[in-house]
């Protein structure tokens, strides 16, 4: 049995297929041209030059709802702490409406506050700065 294994392994050693030759392996040291240059701030750019003029915005502005106007946005930001307290108590827009009516506010102002609170509840973190 041992003789058969030796006889079978001799042609493999002679042809060179059994041994690993490290000279056949080459390493590639390719680096992106954009990653080679350091920008003015001392950071490397990981984007291609074609994407350089893409506009950037903060994440919380991307999360805002499209139907929230600037006036509503400023009103919600003014009332954000109050809305956060209501949210912690698990109060809804109807609870806010009833509370404002008991305090003597008009139906219209209480309804508007309830609508603002509903928009606040859809994404509360977008209104806290």
Curated annotation (Swiss-Prot):
UniProt keyword annotations, A-Z: Host cytoplasm, Host nucleus, Secreted, Signal, Virulence
**Position of sequence motif RxLR-dEER:** 44-56
Say yes or no: keyword Signal present. Answer: yes
Where in the cell?
Secreted; Host cytoplasm; Host nucleus
Q: Which GO terms describe its cellular component?
A: extracellular region; host cell cytoplasm; host cell nucleus
What is the induction note for this entry? Expression is induced during host plant infection.
What is the annotated signal peptide range for this record? 1-16
The protein's role, per its UniProt record: Effector that enhances P.infestans colonization of Nicotiana benthamiana leaves.
The text of the family note is: Belongs to the RxLR effector family.
Q: Print the domain comment field.
A: The RxLR-dEER motif acts to carry the protein into the host cell cytoplasm through binding to cell surface phosphatidylinositol-3-phosphate.
List the protein's name.
Answer: RxLR effector protein PexRD43
Gene behind this protein? PexRD43
């Amino acid at each position: 049995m041992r003789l058969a294994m030796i006889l079978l392994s001799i042609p493999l050693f002679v042809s060179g297929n059994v041994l690993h030759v490290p000279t056949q392996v080459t390493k590639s040291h390719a680096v992106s041209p954009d990653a080679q240059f350091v920008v003015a701030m001392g950071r490397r750019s990981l984007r291609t030059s074609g994407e350089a003029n893409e506009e950037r915005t903060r994440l919380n502005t991307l999360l805002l709802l499209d139907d929230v106007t600037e006036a509503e946005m400023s009103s919600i930001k003014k009332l954000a702490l109050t809305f956060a307290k209501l949210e912690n108590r698990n109060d809804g827009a109807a609870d806010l409406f009833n509370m404002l009516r008991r305090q003597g506010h008009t139906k219209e102002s209480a309804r508007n506050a309830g609508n603002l609170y509903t928009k606040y509840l859809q994404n509360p973190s977008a209104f806290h700065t």
